[in-house]
């Protein structure tokens, strides 16, 4: 007798969630199960015609998923199902004096699906300390599409394309400092530019300044939203600062130039002076052998699994958790203030 389809909920709070959760949706469907999306008000509706959206939290409760997947830092405690953290990037210590936010335990999740050596050991230590969640090293779901060999993007020109994707973190983001430099390089070098911002980089004056530059220069495209793999494949070199997006880009075997990276290393071409960026990009375009070897070593430290089956491992982790651990762990912290704040944010006041 066939089992009924299992239901899962994909919980999106910002636009970056789509590229992270869609590989999961694909695997859920491949197994004959059902996925639905819940979008917070902060997440634009970019769903496709064949994707199911659940519009209210009450409907999400009625959907009764066996698991909910969230790339963000929170998930409503009152929704049914195993709460699964799938992360929105790799651990990057942007500030020297602070532990990476990647490792902050807020008491929302039952499962953390880690990505590789840069995240798993620390989370295993946290699992022993807290006792109310389990850690599974699955690899990052977004990376599945990187290694599936099924994605191709047509290039409209043979000119080198530089992708600029700064972080949003105040005091670290290069977006304010590098506008004049990018404008100068776009005017003087035979390169095309794609400029994208993190959804949280929302300074309207800054956005307008970059948009005006793109409007005036035919070789500059301000795309606002980074479409992940599609955007990466259209470019040859990334210019960045200290964003974890550099790891994603380097996983494709592409070099990155950084401006004042907080943790530079041999896998990056890091510069401290904006005047050196042009030459650094020239060097990156030659793909030096030593640099490319360091890139491979560094990205393997972050993403251990490159077989395109990370989403499958995430679903297997849910099954294992339900079979062996659900109901047998310590209780999560009460989290009363966080829970109240989230209910107020979502305007959900029911018991």
For each feature predicted by the language model, list its residue ranges.
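Active-site and donor-binding regions of nucleotide-sugar-utilizing enzymes
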Residues: 9-149
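Conserved catalytic-core segment of nucleotide-activated headgroup transferases in glycan assembly
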Residues: 17-29, 141-211, 306, 310-312
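Catalytic donor nucleotide-activated moiety binding site of glycosyltransferases and closely related
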Residues: 34-44, 48, 188-224
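Active-site regions of enzymes building and remodeling cell-envelope glycoconjugates
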Residues: 48-58, 80-89, 211-222, 254, ...
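Donor nucleotide-activated moiety binding/catalytic core segment of transferases
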Residues: 55-61, 203-250
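A donor-sugar binding/catalytic signature common to diverse glycosyltransferases
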Residues: 73-74, 79-87, 225-268
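Catalytic binding pocket for nucleotide-activated donors in carbohydrate/polymer assembly enzymes
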Residues: 132, 212, 244-306
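C-terminal amphipathic helix plus adjacent low-complexity
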Residues: 279, 285-351
């Amino acid at each position: 007798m066939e089992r009924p389809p299992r239901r899962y909920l994909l919980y999106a709070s910002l636009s970056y969630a789509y590229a992270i959760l869609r590989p999961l949706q694909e695997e859920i469907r491949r197994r004959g199960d059902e996925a639905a999306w819940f979008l917070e008000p902060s997440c634009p509706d970019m769903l496709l015609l064949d994707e199911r959206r659940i519009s209210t939290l009450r409907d999400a409760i009625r959907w009764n998923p066996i698991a909910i997947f969230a790339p963000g830092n929170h998930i409503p405690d009152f929704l049914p199902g195993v709460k699964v953290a799938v992360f929105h990037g790799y651990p990057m210590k942007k500030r020297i004096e602070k532990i990476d936010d990647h490792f902050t335990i807020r008491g929302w999740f039952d499962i953390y699906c880690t990505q590789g050596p840069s995240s798993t050991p620390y989370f295993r230590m946290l699992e022993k300390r807290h006792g109310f969640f389990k850690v599974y090293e699955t690899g990052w779901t977004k990376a599945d599409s990187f290694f599936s060999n099924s994605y191709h993007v047509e290039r409209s020109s043979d000119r080198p394309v530089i992708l600029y994707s700064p972080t949003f973190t105040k005091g670290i983001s290069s977006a304010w400092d590098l506008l004049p430099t990018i404008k100068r390089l776009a005017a003087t070098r035979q390169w095309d530019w794609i400029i994208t911002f993190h959804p949280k980089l929302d300074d309207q004056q800054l956005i307008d300044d970059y948009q005006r530059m793109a409007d005036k220069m035919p070789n500059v495209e301000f795309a606002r939203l980074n479409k992940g793999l599609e955007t990466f494949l259209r470019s040859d070199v990334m210019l960045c600062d200290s964003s974890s997006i550099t790891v994603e880009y380097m996983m494709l075997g592409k070099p990155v130039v950084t401006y004042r990276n907080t943790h530079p290393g041999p896998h990056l071409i890091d510069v401290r002076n904006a005047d050196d960026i042009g030459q650094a990009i020239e060097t990156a375009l030659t793909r030096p052998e030593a640099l490319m070897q360091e890139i491979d070593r560094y990205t393997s430290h972050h993403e251990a699994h490159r077989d395109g089956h990370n989403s499958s491992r995430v679903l297997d982790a849910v099954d294992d958790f339900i079979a062996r651990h659900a109901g047998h762990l310590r209780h999560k912290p009460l989290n009363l203030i966080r829970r109240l704040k989230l209910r107020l944010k979502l305007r959900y006041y029911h018991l």
